[in-house]
From Swiss-Prot:
Homodimer and heterodimers. Keywords: Cell membrane, Membrane, Transmembrane, Transmembrane helix. The keyword Cell division does not apply. Belongs to the Casparian strip membrane proteins (CASP) family. This is CASP-like protein 2U3. The chain crosses the membrane at residues 5-25, 53-73, 81-101, 133-153. InterPro entries: CASP/CASPL, CASP_dom, CASPL. The lineage of its organism: Eukaryota, Viridiplantae, Streptophyta, Embryophyta, Tracheophyta.
Amino acid sequence: MACRVMEVLLRVLAILLSIAGALVMAKDKQDTFVMLGTVPVPLYARHSYVEAFVFLVYANGIVAIYCFIAVLLSLLAKSRVLAGLLFFMDQALAYLLLAAAAASTEVAYIAKRGEKKLVWGEVCSNFEHFCNLVGVSLVLTFLSVLVLVTLAILSGKRLFGHPPLCAPPSTPPVHQGV
């Protein structure tokens, strides 16, 4: 029972982290002006301008929906087939979210530092607020990845562990006096 509660709490935590990561990124935008001589030129930053950030929003949304469904399934049904499916899906979605976070981290790094070999300048000096919120979203997303990895480890131990994790404690045999 304690393991089921821990699993549900971890899945709820993954839901909250993924929703927060998606919302922070999806709402992230900034408008600014730079001066070219005496002419102000408007600049705009939106998450939708960068495909990696869009991927991050969708991946976080998929993880949140999956974890919600997994909570319902784990509360309603208990079978080895379901445990195997959750083990597989926890890993698959951890990899999906890790891929989205890694791609977005690379874009954020280039935005912050630029890429000298390609003569790409950094842009975060013009969009500091935008870049800071990208960082917040990435932290939330990587935390969600860690929760999913923890769930995959717990699922694997439950399926393949000897003795199985969360197995009911065995009671010693009662000796009757002769």
